[in-house]
Every structure is written in C-alpha cells, then in structure tokens.
Amino acid sequence: MEQDRYLIERYPWLCPYLDDNNDYDYNDTLLDTLPSGWRDLILDLCAELKELLDKYDLVDKYRVAEAKEKWFMLRWYDYLTDGSEMPQDIVDLVMKYEEQSQYVCVLCGSDKSSTKPCCTSCMAIYY
C-alpha cells in the first residue's frame, strides 16, 4: 500500500477511483490491473507524461478512463476532465508506449516478438 500511495501521489491518474474532488483510494493503482511485465514500461510512460502534463498545467485534469492489454498491446484511454482536446505531444507519447508494449513480455518484461504475449523463456515455463 505504501508503494501505491507513492505512485498515486506522484502520478494521480494511476488511481482507478479518482473523482473530480481528487479523492484517492490508495488500495491499488491502474498498474495492478495491467500485466506485471509492463510495469517498468508504464512507469516510464508516467514519468514522461508527468513532464508534459506539468508543461501544460494539466495534471489535475488528466484522467485514464481505462488501461488494458488487447492483442498483446497496451491500450491507454485517457481524457481531460474539462473536455478540452488532448495536446498532440501527449497523444503521440501514449501511442509510442502502446507501440513499444507489443515487444515487451507481459510476464517478465523481456523483449519478445509482437505476435506472442510472452518471451521465449516465459512461453517455455508457462505454456
């Protein structure tokens, strides 16, 4: 829970139950709903995202409606609470990480083929 608290305080959009009053539930984060092998990838995304959100003064308006794995790739659905258009460099950043995710093993985070969910080592162990 302390790790979740740290992450949510640094990246509030990781809180799956964030409301417009910024009331946080520190019991889990969006990271908990995603493949564990993508953790470093998502944290890298969040670090770069925070820089851009700070640049545009959008940290308090930024939300993630859903983050999931689909067809071996990250899908990150975000929006701004005031209904304004997302800055293009934020859109581009999210797309970059969605693309990168298809080459990261969902179990261990190693490099993998884009046509399989896991690297060769994890496939041998788990499948």
Residue ranges and their predicted role:
Residues 5, 100, 109:
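Glycine-rich phosphate-binding loop of ATP-dependent small-molecule kinases
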Residues 97:
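Residue-level marker of regulatory loop/turn positions in helix-turn-helix DNA-binding domains and
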Residues 90-93, 110:
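A domain-level signal for the structural core that forms small-molecule/cofactor-binding pockets
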Residues 116-126:
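Cysteine-rich micro-motifs
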Residues 105-108, 119:
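Short cysteine-rich clusters marking metal-coordination/redox-active sites
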Residues 100-103, 113-114:
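Flanking scaffold residues of small Cys/His-coordinated metal-binding clusters
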Residues 70, 115-116:
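Ser/Thr- and Asn-enriched, surface-exposed coil loops between beta-strands
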Residues 1-91:
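Long, charged N-terminal interaction/targeting segments
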